[in-house]
Amino acid sequence: MDKFNVIVVGGGHAGIEASLAAAKMGKKTLLITILAEQIGAASCNPAIGGLAKGHLVKEIDALGGQMGLTTDAVGIQFRVLNESKGPAVRGSRAQIDMDRYRVYMRNLLLNTPNLEISQEIATEILSANEQITGVKTHLGNVYETTKLIITTGTFLNGLIHVGFNKLKAGRVGELSSINLSQSLRNLGLEMGRLKTGTCPRIDAKTIDFSVLERQEGDAKPAAFSFRTQHFAPEQLPCYIAYTNETTHEIIRSNFDKAPLFTGQIEGIGPRYCPSIEDKINRFGDRDRHHLFIEPQTREASEYYINGFSTSLPYDVQVAMLRSVRGFENARIVRHGYAIEYDYVVPTELKHSLETKKVRGLYLAGQINGTTGYEEAAAQGLMAGINAALNLDAKDPLVLRRDEAYIGVLIDDLVTKGTKEPYRMFTSRAEYRLLLREDNAILRLGGYGRELGLIDDETHARIEQIRVNLAKGLEILNTREFTPSKQNLEFLAGLDEDVISEKVTLQKIVARKSFTSEKLRKLDAFFENLDEASLEQILTECKYSHYIAEQKNQIDKMKDMMSVKIPENFSFRGISGLSNEVVEKLEKFAPPTLFAASEISGITPAAIDILHIYIKMSQR
């Protein structure tokens, strides 16, 4: 019987980050996956990042994860979304060469010390006395471990739908994992059923690109990873097409063949990424819908039709596709489909992503009810880190809501749960002005270094930015700028409005029109600073009032977070708490007063009552 410190089941985006984190933290790690060639496969669109998702990738990178580095290495188009808006809601996004992404990740894992890969199907979770002891595979192999991380994506009891046709699979051409799903149920974990879908892939030579809108990458593309240097990718264009009334009529006339409407699909799909038939049904007043035409590889021989997710029959997919301008002769290489799969209700988890009922069992990714590569990778990284920390008898790394989008993601899952695929949005973060993409390295890089996932050179660069920021703000907040003739001429030379009274330099820099190039001319200290430091200084100046407000809110939140709810605390018998509130508190077992306040249905009045009783119990 082989023994490992950590075993990861599933080679998707969550499994990759979990495996790498555990192995790099010195733990003997095994990754079990159904098909080794598909490690790191992009099952849906060939892109990483986006609004809020880009934040997650930057945070993964700051903690020492891999997703951003690989994206930089194999990306074929890079854009910053919402660039004209404030820094809190900007999102980096990259089109990736999905084939090279897989090869890059697989080779990286194969060459990582302490990490082994085995192509098998995990069939049974082994435990004794509510403690993980190992895992069994379809080959009859038994691997012993005390830390098991399940990252199975859509493979748990996966069922693919195309029209009336159904196929048991975790992805087209790959087996689903049926026994493992039952094994999780046998452990007493509450489970549910979700649904997602994917779009058709089209032969490039059958598309008329001349009638499509061309969408280029940014002229000055920015890397995802702080560790990427000398970044100059060769970029490819994407394209935009539109559905029309003919397309919509074809879809409407085939609603009776749509598994989504016939009752064939039972799982709940993602609210914010609906299928094309769902869009036509819900938004019947719209005369067209955007379709984003995205290359799948650098060779651009196959294109993904983003916005065209469907589970309609194959012949209907062909008809509706060929009704779109530019696709009159299009040939489908890979059809779209819907897939149902089992998931574990995430309120079964602690904030460490360890299950409450079984010690040493961690869950990450779509098995927890999320959707998206980035959400999965973030959870995988945290599960791998916390499994390794637990082996060393150290406290888990639990990121707060004011520290990271990863903290928001996990806190939402474990305190509120989800009944539909959960995806990240900037609106979910109360303190999003503090959780920007640009400061992820400053927020989380220290953790990455402590864990041994960030090297000395990278850590030194991060700390230099921190020093530059402090020094720059000191200069701007303390030095005065008078309306002297020389200063007024200086402002005019920068194409800035003049001043009539003495102000600090910070007031000048806080102007919306003030750029990093202008900042370089303001004082000798800024002249040769790196762009990352300058951007930090500019943002802190421009949004200083709002940042201060959010920091005050955080201080109040920390006071509440510090009030811990004792283990095995009895909520019954507390006067003033309704039966509904008591049942929710018992079900979720929040560790702190703040965690209790995050549970849906727990009122501020209930929190006040609970606070009083906790203090009384501690006397």
Curated annotation (Swiss-Prot):
Family annotation (Gene3D superfamilies): FAD/NAD(P)-binding domain, GidA associated domain, C-terminal subdomain, tRNA uridine 5-carboxymethylaminomethyl modification enzyme MnmG/GidA
In which compartments does the protein localize?
A: Cytoplasm
State its role.
Answer: NAD-binding protein involved in the addition of a carboxymethylaminomethyl (cmnm) group at the wobble position (U34) of certain tRNAs, forming tRNA-cmnm(5)s(2)U34.
Q: Name one GO cellular component term.
A: cytosol
Q: Which NCBIfam families match?
A: mnmG_gidA
User: Which SMART domains does this UniProt record tie to the protein?
Assistant: GIDA_assoc_3
- Entry GO MF terms: flavin adenine dinucleotide binding
| Coiled-coil intervals, chain numbering | none
Needed cofactors: FAD
Sites binding FAD sit at: G10, G11, G12, H13, A14, G15
This one is known as: tRNA uridine 5-carboxymethylaminomethyl modification enzyme MnmG
UniProt keyword Manganese present: no
Biological process terms from the Gene Ontology for this record are: tRNA methylation; tRNA wobble uridine modification
Task: Indicate the secretion signal residues.
Answer: none
Q: Whom does it interact with, and what assembly results?
A: Homodimer. Heterotetramer of two MnmE and two MnmG subunits.
* Keyword terms: Cytoplasm, FAD, Flavoprotein, NAD, tRNA processing
Q: Give the family this protein belongs to, as stated in its UniProt record.
A: Belongs to the MnmG family.
Which annotated residues bind NAD(+)?
A: 269-283
| Primary gene name | mnmG
InterPro entries associated with the record: FAD/NAD-bd_sf (IPR036188), GIDA_C_N (IPR049312), MnmG (IPR004416), MnmG-rel (IPR002218), MnmG-rel_CS (IPR020595), MnmG_C (IPR026904), MnmG_C_subdom (IPR047001), MnmG_C_subdom_sf (IPR044920)
